[in-house]
Structures are given as C-alpha cells and as structure tokens.
C-alpha cells in the first residue's frame, strides 16, 4: 500500500523578522527624544498633558529649566514645579558665541522673552549618578528651555559639562506624520513640502541655501538643477553626476574641499555645505517607467515622469529617464561590479544643505518606490527649505558616536583659526575639522620639521573622559589592561582596553590626577560608553563623564620641543619644573607665569620624537597657540597636519585604530603586547582569560616590511608567499629618512620571522606583486631613545 502519512511541516504561523534598529525608529508613537549638549540648551514646545522626562545621561550634570506660557509669562507651575532661583547658568551660556545656540537665541527673541525676569527649576547635583531621571507633566500649553550649564573646566576639579537626554511623551499625537519636522536652521525664504510620490520645482537665487530634509527617515529624493541663465537661452544643461565624479574624484561630493556639483560644461551649480546622512547615490538614473515595467509593475508612478511634469512649465523637455543625485539612496558596487541597493541610512530629520553657485531652477522628488527597500518599503514625504545667502552656515557632516546617538555636526577646534592661516585643507576626523596638510609647506617639509626641529599639530579630536569617585581605581584596574595601582599621581600610562574575547576596543593613555581621579584619553567615544556601562553593571561608586569639548589640545613634537616650551610653560612650586617632566608624566601648568592661561602639559606624543601635549579650554586655545608659535620661531617650528603625522607614526611603529587594530585584533597581534602584564598585574581585568589563551596560541603577528619598490602600498593590500595569502598590510608610507618604502603588516605566525621574503599583491593580488622583506618592528628608533631623551 502507498504510504499515506502526511509530510513533516514547519509548524505554526510565520514569525516577523527580528530586526534591531536605532532607537529613534523604535520609540512608541508620540514619543520624542532630544539631547541637550553639555554647556548647551534647547527650547521645546509643550501642550496640555504632555509628559517630559529628563535623564542625567552621564551623571553629575546640573540642569536648569525655564518655563513660559504662550503669552511669554514665566511660570514653573506649567510643569507642576517651583522656581528656585535665577537661570544663571542658562544666561551665561547665551552670552557665549557658540553657534550651536543660534536656534535657541532665535526662539527666545521671536517670543520676546526676557530671561532676566525668569525663575528656573534646578535639578541634579554634581554627584548625581548616571541615568537618574526627573519627570514632569504640562498643565497647559507653553515652552520649556532646558539647559545643561557649564563653564571653563577646571582640569584638576574635572568639572566638565555633559549631556542631558529629554523624552517627551505627547498626550495627543500632533498629526498623522510619525515624526515632526525639525526647526529651521534660520528664517526660511521658502518652505516646500514634496508629498510622497510627487516632485516639486522651485527657483533659488545665487548664494542662497537649499535644505533637503528626509521627514520620516529612510526616504530617497532625486535632486536636479539647471543654471537659470542657460534655461533662459533654451539650454537645459542639468547637473551631471559623471562630470561631477570626474572633477571631484569622489563617488559624490561631501562638505569640504570636494563639495561641488557641475553640469556637463563643468560649470559649478551647487556646493554641499552640510550633510547629516553621508550616504547617497550618484550612479543610477532617477527611477523611470522602464524600470517598473521591467520588474512587473507597468504604469507605476516614477520620479522621471514626475520630474517631467514639474519641469515642463520651465521649458525643460521631458526625458525617459533623468540623471540626478539621489540623496539618501543607499547604493554601492560590490567586488564583482554588481550595483546593489538597500535601505537608506537617513534618520528622521536628516538633511543635505546646498549653496546655489548661480541662479537655479531646481526640482526635488519624494521617490515612490514601494517595490524594494529603497525607501524602507514605505515611501514618505520630503521637505525643502531655502535660506537667504546672508545667513552663515559652517561646513559640517553629522557624526554619531553610536547608532542610537543624536547627530553631532562637525566642529572647529579651538585651534582651527590658527591653523587656517596656513591651509584650507581640512578633513573631517571624528566630528572635528583637522588640518590635513599645510598649503604653505606640505607633508614632506612638515615631516622633516618634526624629525629635525619641532612642529605643532592639532589633536583636539582625541576623546577625553573624567573618571572620578571612590571606586575609580578599582574600575580602571578592571577596564584597562595595564596595572593602575602602580600609576602615581602625575603619571601617564599607555594601555589597551579589551572586550571579553580579547579584541581591542581602543588604545590610549590614562592620566592619574589624584587618589580617586583619572582621565582616559583615547580615539573613540565608545571607549567612554563602555567604561560607563561597566561601572553601572558593577554598581561602582564612580562617574564617567565626557570632557572632549572642554579640553582641546595641541602636540608640540620634535628634538627642540623641550627648549621651546621651557620659554612658555610655568609650573607651580609644588609641581615639577617643566624641564624636569619625565617621559609619560604630566603637570598642571600655566602659559607664561602664574597669571597665565591654565593648561595641562604632558610628556607624551604620537610621533616617535621627544614631544609634549598641551591641553586647554577651547576659549584659551588661541592664546596657547600664539605663545607656542612665537617662542617656536627661534626653533624652526612648523605647523603639521594629519598626513605628515601618519608618516612619522608609521615609521615609529605607533598603531592606529581601524588600520593596525580592530575589535578582532588583540594587543599582541597589534604589536603592543607590553600593555598586557599577565604575570605582574595582581587583579583580574576584562579579557584576561582570552588574552592568556591568545598569547599561548598566537595566530597573527604585526611585523615591519621593507619593500623593494617605490610603488605605493595601501592599507588592506594582501601579503603573499607564492599563491597563498599569509597576511595584509595595515599601514604604509615612503620614508624620507630611511630612503625606502616601508609598511606595517599583520601576518600568519608561521611566517613572521625576520628576513622572510614575501610579496605584496596589487591589482587583483596576483597580476602585480611587490617583493618585500620582513624586518624588525619598528623601523625608526625601535628602542624609543628619542622620546626618552
């Protein structure tokens, strides 16, 4: 008989896809999140019944709240609270010239508020634990101003200013839209809503600004423009992405030096000033009828037809498919040359800010594609605002320390104006504009000045965190690989910080300011997040607060740096004299004399030379730089940028995150095994067991390479013995002093012996090879005699 048994099946109904997304997309409807930056403030509108919750994100940050009704009357009772004094912290902030407070000033002026007559609700103390919250409910409509006051940080008191997080839970949803439109950057000239699956054309004068906003996030928008004068002559030369890519040398322009879009005659049309997303498409056409026809959706509405309809009144002939820059469209080319697309990176409120370089006729669409992930499977609206050319907007991109973080726009360091005297070549690095090289010299001259005389460079983008409290030493001992119990007050130690599996989170330095006072200086914001998370998990009595914006720093490096700074740095009698400062030691100091600008000076650096770093509040940066620069004239001082810094650090074998190590690399594989005292450190630390295993059974080793060729080698180039790949290049440079091409590479432990001959693969890794030899690490002064001198 036939077997009549039913086949096995997968039981039950289907389950939804498990997708983890940034918190902004998972907030319940009617809930909004805002961040008040340290030493900053925001203005928010409240309606009856709205609930507001304020979180002391990092701990220890006081808060001031000013409430006003719709008539401008101040009343803390609007949120059921009582005023406890004047908003002195808020008023002090508003006297500063901080551009981030521009929108707040506009809001206060527009409402005619006189803060000198206001009372403030004061929340939190300097000892308030991280994560502490206070909640209020609005009894009627009005506005609240929430401030996180902060002044010039005392480096020894470590009284930094840190963010507050604000949640508003609306009693009544304002509209059908999930997300509200952010406030304008200035007074708009035009406010244009581009509804889903439509396009709008608009005119923009030369010099004016165009802000293109993604209202709800994950929404693409094609943008096209024409020089109005050409259109008047019947010439419809549109923005040409092929010409633009060729002239800019980038997939698409970004704020900075490579920021302009051109037409086919190479006339610049617009310049990118700000970009909070950083992911766009300049390869594919705007979606067209043929695309939908070919995938089985004939008659589907499309951006090209919408462009044709919007541009027809301006005398522009229709096209079957429009070339465009598709803002927020997430595309790329894989290793096989296949173009792919996925959900956009854009969040609600993300935008691109352009400046018109000539009178323009523009058109913007809200892409209708609901057949793919191009719009997150849910097409929504786009919004366009234009602003007068009389407004001033700094060039910036958005930086998010973590996926859940609110965007931070690129900042200028306190030293920016001083370096801008020598160059316009600044690059975005970790949320700051830093000089790449000097137009007055160039990286080779800067390199030689560092090796032979002295240089000054801006390293303000380094992340600083204040670790304070009775359990601070215990926390540092557990978090960092080095032994913090042996670190004296006034001492600095270079260390790694690892995950439990032994992979590195970051490398950096720890300063000990007191018995219970430490400062971590590393390369990433996440290092501080990790330290704070561990403190909370362990229940330790310690605060971990960011101070990056309170401490900007220059490095003065080179053989003559000590003689130079002897003329500049004053230390108190109970501190070591500057010239007595030992390697990896620091001291609070002042510029010039006991009345000078307060600084912290450390004998540390990232060049392989004798050198120092000077930390100060951004407001004092100009005075610090000027004093160093003036004293340095007799010592041949030169400004140095990141390009030359990369050269000297590679020669000296100093590692760089993202190149020489990652979270898949342990300190031994990164060449800094000396930071892991497995036998001498008496206490456990995160990653110890994994590091013991990795040390006893190594897989890869960081080595030096001497390359028998002047052909440039790059990060990620493969290293071979015969057909087999045995490693990859992590960093490389052409050494002026050594007179050869050198590199750092991570190779299999089976082939790491000095003298081993290898080949570096170019092109596809096989068609072109560069012979090289494994040499001792590091190439330049491996015993570090120069920084010790």
Swiss-Prot record:
Query: Does the record's keyword annotation contain Lyase?
Result: yes
Q: Does the keyword DNA repair apply?
A: no
Q: What is the organism of origin for this protein?
A: Ruegeria pomeroyi (strain ATCC 700808 / DSM 15171 / DSS-3)
What are the annotated disulfide bridges?
none
As for what it does, the entry says:
Catalyzes the conversion of trimethylamine N-oxide (TMAO) to dimethylamine (DMA) and formaldehyde.
As recorded in UniProt, its EC number(s) are: 4.1.2.32
**Name the UniProt record assigns to this protein:** Trimethylamine-oxide aldolase
Which reaction equations make up its catalytic activity?
trimethylamine N-oxide + H(+) = dimethylamine + formaldehyde
What gene is this protein a product of? tdm
After gene disruption, what is the outcome? Disruption mutant cannot grow on TMAO or its upstream precursor trimethylamine (TMA) as a sole nitrogen source, although it can grow on dimethylamine (DMA) and monomethylamine (MMA).
What SUPFAM superfamilies is this protein classified in?
Aminomethyltransferase beta-barrel domain, Folate-binding domain
According to its record, what are the GO cellular component terms?
Answer: cytosol
Q: Which family does it belong to?
A: In the C-terminal section; belongs to the GcvT family.
Against InterPro entries, the record matches this protein to: DUF1989, GCST_C, GCV_T_N, GcvT/YgfZ/DmdA, GcvT/YgfZ_C, TrmE/GcvT_dom1
Gene3D superfamilies per the UniProt record, alphabetical: Probable tRNA modification gtpase trme, domain 1 (3.30.1360.120)
